[in-house]
Amino acid sequence: MAQPANQVGRITQVIGAVVDVQFDGYLPAILNAIETTNQGHRLVLEVAQHLGESTVRAIAMDTTEGLVRGQEVTDTGAPIKVPVGEGTLGRIMNVVGEPVDEGGPVKADGTRAIHQEAPAYTEQSTEAEILVTGIKVVDLLAPYAKGGKIGLFGGAGVGKTVLIQELINNVAKAHGGYSVFAGVGERTREGNDLYHEFIESGVNKKGGGEGSKCALVYGQMNEPPGARARVGLTGLTVAEHFRDQGQDVLFFVDNIFRFTQAGSEVSALLGRIPSAVGYQPTLATDMGALQERITTTTKGSITSVQAIYVPADDLTDPAPATSFAHLDATTVLNRAISEKGIYPAVDPLDSTSRMLSPLVVGEEHYQTARMVQQVLQRYKSLQDIIAILGMDELSEEDKLTVARARKIERFLSQPFHVAEVFTGSPGKFVELADTIKGFKGLCEGKYDHLPEAAFYMVGTIEEAVEKGKKLAAEAA
């Protein structure tokens, strides 16, 4: 269908990912998708600002090398629309919904705009139910909510992606419903590994189609900032469609920080004055627009797990700090713990969850979690004394506390299924009842006779006892 002549504009300026387009007596709306061809490929741009009477400033969703001034650009009259529905399962799409897995066109139920309103208060659901992950430290100290929002915070190389992959392994594979994975500005290698891992484990069928359970939406590190700033919304749009059909959806995002980072790259090019630490002035608004849409309604639920990179291990940095307010549970990964060789390197005192209340998890679970935190907190406060004076200067009671705390620390570690290839030890899924039983026994002193090494990288407490016997036999 030919566009009306005035809906065709011409490029007047190209600055990196930002392109100015002049129309004649016509202005496309903000957030509209406008299209041109670049070296034989369709290039989509999103209108970000109106400059003067007939010029718009747009953000490119793909590379702008090869664009020239005077080139024609057409307004589509609507925001970016992406395919949604069961045809997306097992497929990899990019930010504008084009397949990138060489599997032919996506057979979708229809398309949906990536910019949507967040559900109204009256449509939201407030049920409290725990999502068991099989990871001891998470289930005990900062349990996840079904239909809640979960953030995994950590600096570079402390294990966020491995933890998110283990959650996909433990939760998505056992989960009957659909999952959506949004790769936002992370390594392409990891995205490729995940795609093949899903096919090998039977979550997806090669080339999509019947039996696939997870849709993948990628805008990785090599993409321009426009794609990285919008790919999270594309993934969310696919997840929202499943939710509105009455499904319980799992939505994984790796990494939310890259969404913020892309926004800050584009923000300067758009001429906005930067705010704290050079971030965009609209940081909280951008984050809110994404996070408020990730919610559970009366129709269906979205349980989201988001990895959030912490620049220079500083949790007060504006990017991670802005996302804290939106989450139901936070799992904080700590470099000091990973340096001890304890994986997952979750900080048991810094991680929080609104589900850790006796009304939700029950009295026994709550008391056990608090006992564990009490012992670990006491150990933390004694560490200065130990460093200066040594263990001998502690009272008998404190010596016992330290011994138990060190055992608890090691028992919080656990071998992962996704790390089997690196570690050689088989992964463990620990049921919640076994987790509570093990830590309760540890705090009550039932296992004071076992050596520390017996608790390292095991699943249940029975395995620790078994390992203790084995170590004793070897020593004898």
Curated annotation (Swiss-Prot):
Keyword terms of this UniProt record: ATP synthesis, ATP-binding, Cell inner membrane, Cell membrane, CF(1), Hydrogen ion transport, Ion transport, Membrane, Nucleotide-binding, Translocase, Transport
UniProt subcellular location: Cell inner membrane
Reactions catalysed according to its record: ATP + H2O + 4 H(+)(in) = ADP + phosphate + 5 H(+)(out)
Pfam family of the protein (one) = ATP-synt_ab
Task: Output the PANTHER family linked to this UniProt entry.
Answer: ATP SYNTHASE, ATP SYNTHASE SUBUNIT BETA, MITOCHONDRIAL
Question: Where do the TM regions start and end?
Answer: none
Q: Which family does it belong to?
A: Belongs to the ATPase alpha/beta chains family.
Which GO cellular component terms are attached? plasma membrane; proton-transporting ATP synthase complex
Q: Which GO terms describe its molecular function?
A: ATP binding; ATP hydrolysis activity; proton-transporting ATP synthase activity, rotational mechanism
The protein's job, in short, is:
Produces ATP from ADP in the presence of a proton gradient across the membrane. The catalytic sites are hosted primarily by the beta subunits.
Q: Indicate yes or no for the key word Disulfide bond.
A: no
Q: Which CDD domains match?
A: ATP-synt_F1_beta_C, ATP-synt_F1_beta_N, F1-ATPase_beta_CD
**Which InterPro entries would you find in this protein's record?**
AAA+_ATPase, ATP-synt_VA_C, ATP_synth_F1_bsu, ATPase_a/bsu_AS, ATPase_alpha/beta_chains, ATPase_F1/V1/A1_a/bsu_N, ATPase_F1/V1/A1_a/bsu_N_sf, ATPase_F1/V1/A1_a/bsu_nucl-bd
Subunit and partners:
F-type ATPases have 2 components, CF(1) - the catalytic core - and CF(0) - the membrane proton channel. CF(1) has five subunits: alpha(3), beta(3), gamma(1), delta(1), epsilon(1). CF(0) has three main subunits: a(1), b(2) and c(9-12). The alpha and beta chains form an alternating ring which encloses part of the gamma chain. CF(1) is attached to CF(0) by a central stalk formed by the gamma and epsilon chains, while a peripheral stalk is formed by the delta and b chains.
Q: How does it sit in the membrane?
A: Peripheral membrane protein
What is this protein's record name?
Answer: ATP synthase subunit beta
Protein EC: 7.1.2.2
Gene name of this polypeptide: atpD
Q: Which residues of the sequence carry a binding annotation for ATP?
A: G154, G155, A156, G157, V158, G159, K160, T161
